[in-house]
């Protein structure tokens, strides 16, 4: 079995481009903004791609404090958190409990909306793909707090580094409101650095214009 190498943003960007996870062009977002790039982590749907993403989360978590439990919000976060637990064990020799939530509560069997490791009295890191408006993260934070957990922080794959409705980005709003750290594996700046290194002048110019208009 090949041991995954350490996560590098450029390698992840190249893999994301090859899988169609990351695209440069013209895309209308739910907010109505026309973005020069699009990121869909749901297309990280093979072993190699998921392994590299999980390695990134695992590497980042080893630099974080208070990692009692890692948690993946339903549904997209579930494979991410499971793969991250494996990566932590295989490459960092850390056996970290993990869990996730259901969208609908069960009234039989183990019941409830939480599945996996117990979170009561634990410091929990949430693992997800992106924070767009912050609505989903706020919902899962409420669920975890109601179960007696302390939220230690959030890890996401991409920080778009753009303003929400106000002057802050969605990530900055979550950090300020919930008083927790939010870390990202790659940022919009990483994407721009990649385009510059590859000599992709048109795509880079589009990114620069977008960042000047909406960036933080």
UniProtKB/Swiss-Prot annotation:
It is an enzyme of class 2 (transferase). Gene3D superfamilies: 3.40.50.2020. Orotate binds at residues 38-39, 132, 160. Keywords: Glycosyltransferase, Magnesium, Pyrimidine biosynthesis, Transferase. GO terms for molecular function: magnesium ion binding; orotate phosphoribosyltransferase activity. InterPro entries: OPRT, Or_phspho_trans_dom, PRibTrfase_dom, PRTase-like. It catalyses: orotidine 5'-phosphate + diphosphate = orotate + 5-phospho-alpha-D-ribose 1-diphosphate. GO terms for cellular component: cytoplasm. SUPFAM superfamilies: PRTase-like (SSF53271). It comes from the Bacteria. Its cofactor is Mg(2+). It holds the Pfam family Pribosyltran. Its EC number is 2.4.2.10. Homodimer. Belongs to the purine/pyrimidine phosphoribosyltransferase family. PyrE subfamily. Catalyzes the transfer of a ribosyl phosphate group from 5-phosphoribose 1-diphosphate to orotate, leading to the formation of orotidine monophosphate (OMP). This is Orotate phosphoribosyltransferase. The lineage of its organism: Bacteria, Pseudomonadati, Pseudomonadota, Gammaproteobacteria, Moraxellales. The gene is pyrE.
């Amino acid at each position: 079995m090949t041991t995954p190498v350490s996560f590098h943003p450029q390698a992840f960007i190249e893999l994301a481009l090859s899988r169609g996870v990351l695209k440069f062009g013209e895309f209308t977002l739910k907010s109505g903004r026309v973005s020069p790039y699009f990121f869909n982590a749901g297309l990280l749907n093979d072993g190699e791609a998921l392994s590299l993403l999980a390695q990134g989360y695992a590497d980042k978590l080893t630099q974080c404090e208070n990692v009692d439990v890692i948690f993946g919000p339903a549904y997209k976060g579930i494979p991410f958190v499971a793969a991250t637990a494996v990566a932590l064990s295989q490459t960092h020799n850390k056996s970290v409990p993990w869990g996730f939530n259901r969208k609908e509560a069960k009234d039989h069997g183990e019941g409830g909306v939480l599945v996996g490791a117990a979170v009561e009295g634990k410091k929990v890191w949430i693992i997800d793909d992106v924070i767009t408006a912050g609505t989903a993260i706020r919902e899962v934070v409420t669920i975890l707090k109601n179960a007696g957990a302390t939220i230690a922080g959030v890890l996401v794959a991409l920080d778009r580094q753009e303003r929400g409705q106000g002057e802050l980005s969605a990530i900055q709003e979550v950090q300020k409101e919930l008083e927790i750290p939010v870390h990202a594996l790659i940022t919009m700046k990483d994407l721009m650095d990649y385009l510059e290194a590859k000599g992709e002048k048109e795509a880079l110019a589009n990114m620069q214009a977008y960042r000047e208009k909406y960036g933080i």
